[in-house]
Amino acid sequence: MKVELSKVPILGKDVVHVGFDIADHIVDTIFQSCPSSTYVVINDTNVEKIPHYVDLCGELQAKLKSGSRILQYSVKPGEAHKTREQKAAIEDYLLSEGCTRDTVIIAVGGGVIGDMIGYVASTFMRGVRVVQVPTSLLAMVDSSIGGKTAVDTPLGKNFIGAFWQPQFVFVDIKWLETLPKREFINGIAEVIKTACIWNAEEFARLEENADLFLQVVNGSKTTQVSVQGQVHELSLTNIDAMLEHVYRLVLESIKVKTHVVSSDEREAGLRNLLNFGHTIGHAYEAILTPQALHGECVSIGMIKEAELSRYLNILSPTQVARLTKILAAYGLPISPDQKWFKDLTLNKKTPLDVLLKKMSIDKKNDGSKKKAVLLETIGKCYGTSAHVVSDEDIRFVLTDETLVYPFKTLENGQEKTIVPPGSKSISNRALILAALGEGTCKIKNLLHSDDTKHMLHAVQQLKGATITWEDNGETVVLKGHGGSTLQATAEPLYLGNAGTASRFLTSVAALVNSTSSQKSVVLTGNARMQERPIGPLVDSLRENGISIDYLNKEKSLPLKINTDSNFKGGRIELAATVSSQYVSSILMCAPYAEEPVTLALVGGKPISKLYIDMTIKMMEKFGIYVKASTEEPNTYHIPKGHYVNPPEYVIESDASSATYPLAYAAMTGTTVTVPNIGFESLQGDARFARDVLKPMGCSVTQTETSTTVTGPPVGGLKPLKHVDMEPMTDAFLTACVVAAVAHDGKEGSRNTTTIEGIANQRVKECNRILAMVDELAKFGVEANELPDGIQVHGLSSIDKLKVPEAIHSYDDHRVAMSFSLLAGMVGATKDALSEPVRILERSCTGKTWPGWWDVLHTQLGAKLDGSEPLQSAVKKNSNSSIVIIGMRAAGKTTVSSWCANALGFKFLDLDTVFEEQYKKGSVKEFVAEHGWDAFRATETKIFEESVKKYGEGYVLSTGGGIVEGAASRKSLKQFASQGGIVLHLHRDIDETIKFLNSDPTRPAYNEDIRNVWERREEWYKECANFTFYAPHCTSSTQFNQLRKTFETFIRTISGKREVKIPTNRSSFVCLTFDDLAAHKEKIPDITAGCSAVELRVDQLKSYDLDFVAKQLSILRLASSSLPIIFTIRTKSQGGQFPDDDKSTLGSLLSLALEVGVEFVDMELTLSSELQYSLVNNKRNTKIIGSHHDFDAKFDWNDSEWENRYNQALSLDVDVVKFVGTAKDFEDNLKLEQFRLQHTAKPLIAINMTDVGKMSRVLNTVLTPVTSSLLPSASAPGQLTLSQINEIYTLLGGFSAKNFYVVGSPISHSRSPVLHNTGYKILGLPHKFEKFETSSASEVKDKLLSKCKLGGLAVTIPLKLDIMEFMDELSESAKLIGAVNTVIPLGDGKFKGDNTDWLGIYNSFLANGVPENVRGNSGFVIGAGGTSRAAVYALHQLGCSDIHLVNRTVEKPHDLKKSFPSEYNLHVLEDSQQAEGISGSVALAVSCVPADKPLDDNLLARVRAVLAKAQGTSFKPTLLEAAYKPAVTPMMKTASDEFSWHIIPGSQMLVHQGVAQFQLWTGFRAPFNAIYSAVTEEQA
């Protein structure tokens, strides 16, 4: 297909040329119209990969005239390079090439290139000619036209620039062939915008072609092209398939912009109409960039600004609905809360205050006043420029939570006429009848809502009718085909929460014809829709020959209707006591049955008979006459036939919706008229004013077609003793809120209004009766349910209405609209300012009255505001309870108690709760008496009650079979989906079976245990969002290690422990074992000095999920919970994992998140699906975005790295890791330049090969290293940590520092051997020596003045004296009152710290003591300096009380006075006090000299306290602070007499020294080697 070349004038010149494949024309025009000595083509490096660019440059070169030259300059792609610095670099290049004022610059690229190069042209030589060749849709229709040029600054986009009109803008649509799909759709937003503000005809054309566009763009394919010897992957779209459409949309959009620019070049007024959608859109973009694109944010902005126009009573709801529909149809977001868009933007929050702040710096604002472009109708703006809008109104449209203020601002005698939207009931019936009918029918006043949108879409999917629009979208035109064209579709009919549509379409589906490839239709909806009943209708259709399957829950959607089965007709019996819609559904489809239908309604009195009458009357209008049986009650005869569509059908306004403005009049004492609903209405709810409001004290005037209500003075409504609302069940909610403020004035009266006949309201969008009871209670209004109704007990005064907590709408339009009325009555009669009432989910009113809030605000005068959403009850890092699931004997009870202890939660075993409720023995006895099924049902009930009752601050341990029940699984998944933790505790199944077979206390399974596991395994995975693999422990050491590992794990996944990215020089070691089990003893030495450890999953011998989980468990235990980097390196990225096994890869990456690893390496070459799955489900895990160039394809200046870096930023990874391949040494220098220019995220950037080793030395964050203990390095050129440090030292990166231990006597000090061992192993150049002195002044004079001082270890007697020379003190040093560590700060300043307490604290942790020992007391023996550190450490461990004993009693009292009262220190002066201690003492620290006999009095008190160790969840533990002798008298007493676990003093010594080492060097010390060196020396 060919399209003609079009020239569009701007400012009087034919500047814009639009065509397809016009490279020849571009070149000829430039050379003919812009003669020059120098032409400079400037583009970004991405464009160079496109063949069309090569063709264009080739044409320029081939046709260049003699005496002229062509230069070419490339810039790096992306907004990050649209800077003043880049502009200067371009200008320097032009100057260096001798470019003069006759230069012509040709800008080839997207918006970034066009903006920046235009600005270069505007200032170079005071202005040179520029030609724009836009290559993206957005640039073609927007940025290239109009002469706006700019660069970005750190403070904002486009803040520095100029207006500089190009000589030409060449729009060659061929560029769009290689535009990626998302970029294509992104540009469409601006196209829709221009049509929306200026060209209604083009807007309608865009509506008609939306399906074609999305079909073609979604069909784009990736292809490989060779450009100048290099192969590149490009997206390729078949533009030919929609060339006419794309050409037109580009051309028409350009015409709008050129016209506006020609009228207002400098944006004095008219031109800012082009900013429709941008005021709010730019605010979203500022927060969501770079994940969200400009057009995507403008799309959301257009919706919000259209809603703002509707809110201000300027734009009709129909026009908003059209705009919403077209944006969605072109694949653009219409709300920031759409799941796919939230996933794309990584679930970033868009806080209301931040959005408003971003809007405040919009260039078109009037000072502090915000301006927005308002829409009058599709194709026309309101006025000729942007309008000032209030923050209050903006806030309202930006949020789904609204604040309703008291109705105080009403005019006296206010009279309003309100026209509600078309009836939902009539709208849906009319659409079905017209679709089944023959001929064209124009339907007017159709309700434009979610329900009707789903119905229209379904009719189109089934090919039931041809649908067009007239009157600018206000009138829908259906050309029905008499049902003959109904056709099965493979795509499920998604109906949201549209109950009416679902019921009507179930019968319509029975008339659908099969195709050769499709034999069924599937109806589905949202979660609530899949709970609502449809059973009676399905039963009747099944009995009539229609084959229907439930695909999920019985009696609810989704349904699968077999289209090969026929609707036979004849007698049909239907239970109609739940919903009249079942009846209407069969009635409307009955004429198309094979035989005439007799429909008998059975099972009791039919509900809502007036709606059945409505259907029958409407069928008459379409030519089918239904006769009621004269012989049988509630029975109808429907003849065979075809509907004949009337030329026009006008939908009556919705009578249910009309109840809200009428009730508003009743409650506020004002007058409201609804002009198109009267007593002749088809709808039962038209009776509401006459049968409900009038008896309650209102004046009601009703004609055939109108209803007027005037309320009594405020507070004058009377309760209604009894009303049967069966003819108008939907209106009962409105009646309830009116009744809430109705009273009879009698003292002691309950002011009761009784409403009956509404049982069907329990199965609507929610259980409406219960919802009204619950939400009325929040206002202080009592209500109670009746079998088929509700009683509301009104308040004696409106002043008694309470300001409730947030009102929940249950995603139910009628609940929200009803409570919007009662909300305004709170405080309405009080003079003082009253708080507003918050209503949640306000947008649910879109189901029937999208503009209800606009009417309430603009027409009825209510004050509304928007508000930041309340936080969900269950949030990450909250005290949300944790549920633990797993097989019997997995260790749930033990681990749950650890979990509770670590988090400070309470522990609840649901088996224990069961036994308490059962009160007849154990679970085993219950099962023996009642069976497993009864137990499961009871267990599920208890679980659901417990989750609700103990939702915060608890650890709930469940029975192994909790996942057997579907209801329990649903509750577990719901809890997890709200941010709660459901933890699957997993053990080796063989070990579990072995244990269970030997345990007689548990009820026996009726089947093989392994079979039970195999059945439950998937259920555990389905319900849990975290997994912990607990290996079998064979010793107390392993058990303690497991506890410590678990506590670190649970604190990490719950957010109590932050995963930190190192900020100093750091490294991780890359493990290359194929199975860690045989090498776990080596892991502590392999990981020495490293900040993390990488598990190369691709190098493991098996990718089985259980095997990998075990490997992770081994690694956690062996490395003492060192942060794990989980890496699966694919073959294309230099690893061993198959590139094509995406399924296993996805499962393994999911496992990584489920087991809570600290880091996941995510290759930037993975599919978008996997990448977004990772980043959106990462929880507390950090993501490393990695890219490797093993084949040395890309120089560090190549755009590949820039594009990958921008990709990493758009994915918002936590760390970027780039690995190149060095061919020569200069590659390292280029890498360092790249590192300097890319600082937005922590960057690991290295080169492989021996030549690239230097880059590993210079890398700062998380450098990958190997170890001599590993079988091989994981990459070419990889170094050990000590090698890196040694080379870095040789380069001057590390300066040798001198460290000293100071004090006296220190001849036996182990500090030098401790620290020097660490320095040697890690390759550090430092030296540690002794400096013996008793004078702090001497230390100051001789050591603190040394320039190479690295730090001091301070011992007796200087721990107090040295403090006067410190400039800063750590919190621990202040409270302990002593310094044992001096840290130089530079400039002659020093910080004093204390690591003695860490020596004590970490020694306890290393010996199985949990991080928090809540409920247990501590014990300190002695009252010297070390005792102070012991007190501090025990408090940090969570000891509830700390008991002190000393040989003399004065010193411990002094010690007690120096600590805060919350430490709960108790001095035990005698044995009687010691024996009187209540509670358990679990930790003790001995700080008395070990080389002298113990005082008898002191020993007696010690023994009394040690005897108090009872009932702890860990073995009571005593730490001996003295490290000589190896076994002290105190150690023997505690161990031999009281069986306490003993920690020798050498451990405290090493732990406090290791803490110093890490403070001074920043490196994690090699603990095992240091400990061996210290203890060997000691021996």
Curated annotation (Swiss-Prot):
Location of the region described as 3-dehydroquinase in the Swiss-Prot/TrEMBL record: 1071-1283
Source taxonomy: Eukaryota, Fungi, Dikarya, Ascomycota, Saccharomycotina
Residues the entry annotates as binding NAD(+): 44-46, 79-82, 110-112, 115, 135-136, 157, 175-178, 186
Pfam families linked: DHQ_synthase, DHQS_C, DHquinase_I, EPSP_synthase, SDH_C, Shikimate_DH, Shikimate_dh_N, SKI
Keyword list, A-Z: Amino-acid biosynthesis, Aromatic amino acid biosynthesis, ATP-binding, Cytoplasm, Kinase, Lyase, Metal-binding, Multifunctional enzyme, NADP, Nucleotide-binding, Oxidoreductase, Transferase, Zinc
Co-factor: note: Binds 2 Zn(2+) ions per subunit.
SUPFAM superfamilies: Aldolase (SSF51569), Aminoacid dehydrogenase-like, N-terminal domain (SSF53223), Dehydroquinate synthase-like (SSF56796), EPT/RTPC-like (SSF55205), NAD(P)-binding Rossmann-fold domains (SSF51735), P-loop containing nucleoside triphosphate hydrolases (SSF52540)
HAMAP family (alphabetical): EPSP_synth, Pentafunct_AroM, Shikimate_kinase
Catalytically driven reaction(s): 7-phospho-2-dehydro-3-deoxy-D-arabino-heptonate = 3-dehydroquinate + phosphate; 3-dehydroquinate = 3-dehydroshikimate + H2O; shikimate + NADP(+) = 3-dehydroshikimate + NADPH + H(+); shikimate + ATP = 3-phosphoshikimate + ADP + H(+)
Pathway membership, UniProt: Metabolic intermediate biosynthesis; chorismate biosynthesis; chorismate from D-erythrose 4-phosphate and phosphoenolpyruvate: step 2/7; Metabolic intermediate biosynthesis; chorismate biosynthesis; chorismate from D-erythrose 4-phosphate and phosphoenolpyruvate: step 3/7; Metabolic intermediate biosynthesis; chorismate biosynthesis; chorismate from D-erythrose 4-phosphate and phosphoenolpyruvate: step 4/7; Metabolic intermediate biosynthesis; chorismate biosynthesis; chorismate from D-erythrose 4-phosphate and phosphoenolpyruvate: step 5/7
Family, similarity comment: In the N-terminal section; belongs to the sugar phosphate cyclases superfamily. Dehydroquinate synthase family. In the 2nd section; belongs to the EPSP synthase family.
InterPro entries xref list: 3-dehydroquinate_DH_AS (IPR018508), Aldolase_TIM (IPR013785), Aminoacid_DH-like_N_sf (IPR046346), DHQ_synth_AroB (IPR016037), DHQS/DOIS_N (IPR030960), DHQS_C (IPR056179), DHquinase_I (IPR001381), Enolpyruvate_Tfrase_dom (IPR001986)
Native source organism of the sequence: Lachancea thermotolerans (strain ATCC 56472 / CBS 6340 / NRRL Y-8284)
Compartments reported by the entry: Cytoplasm
Cofactor: Zn(2+)
Active-site residues, as the UniProt record annotates them: E267 (proton acceptor), H282 (proton acceptor), C844 (for epsp synthase activity), H1188 (proton acceptor), K1217 (schiff-base intermediate with substrate)
Positions of Zn(2+) binding: E190, H278, H294
Protein function: The AROM polypeptide catalyzes 5 consecutive enzymatic reactions in prechorismate polyaromatic amino acid biosynthesis.
Subunit details: Homodimer.
GO molecular function, one term: shikimate kinase activity
NCBIfam families given in the database record: aroA, aroB, aroD, Shik-DH-AROM
Region of interest (Shikimate kinase), ranges: 881-1070
Binding site for ATP: G886, M887, R888, A889, A890, G891, K892, T893
Region feature (EPSP synthase): 404-862
Region (Shikimate dehydrogenase): 1296-1579
Gene Ontology CC, one term: cytoplasm
Protein name: Pentafunctional AROM polypeptide
